[in-house]
Amino acid sequence: GIRALWNHIIDVSVSDLKKNYAALNVEFDLWKGESDVQDIIPGMVEKMKNDGYAHESEGALVVDVKEETDTKEVPPCMILKSDGASLYNTTDLATIVDRMEKYQPDKLIYMTDKRQDLYFEQVFRCARKTGLVKPETQLIHIGFGTMNGKDGKPFKTREGGVMRLENLIREINEEMYRKIAENREMEKEEAEETSKVVALSAVKYGDLSNQASKDYIFDIDRFTSFEGDTGPYILYTIVRIKSILKKYNEQSGGDN
């Protein structure tokens, strides 16, 4: 049925995500989705209504979150649509309830696209106003910039579609393999393994070397270069240093 298909889609999606994260040596302690907090939503919404925080506006259920000190408009936080369906706001608020009950954190940090600043301001204000968190609990949104192509626009494929992470990793792996195979004499298998390691440094350093909140240009040619401020150059430098130290120890008899 529909639920079985839905569960299958989730399994395939999570499996694909884990594969991509594994390629970047990234691990998570917990994997939680929106569906994990669906059971919390009805009680949370009912409490907001009973406490007088949630009210109807044009058929939808909302919580007003504007404050007198606001210098710009902050729209109400919508809890349910006019047809009774929940939204991202709803599940994010339910997730806060879940985390507070299970972990009692002093601080919750959300890292997403900086264009979601207003959204999280609404959600955080709603969580505070309705008592989902203690007054001293810190709710923080850290917004990061977008990765753009050479034209300054969001990074896309040659065909103009959205660049998937796995495709980006593959393209960089292929470019690193090409450069290593052209300039160094080594077996094909060794070149492939080396290119994967160096490509990973190109991706990570290329991203992390920029200020997180700023948009930046992801230039595959530049980031895979063995010259300049790049991940491959740093690895090359480390290898050179180790080679020098090894030769020194060999010539000095390993005394130092």
Model-derived segments and their meaning:
Residues 10-226, 231, 235-248:
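Alpha-helical recognition segments enriched in aromatics with Gly/Pro capping
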Residues 1-13:
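Long, well-ordered, tryptophan-enriched scaffold segments
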Residues 248-256:
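Extended, well-ordered alpha-helical scaffold/bundle regions in very large, multi-domain proteins
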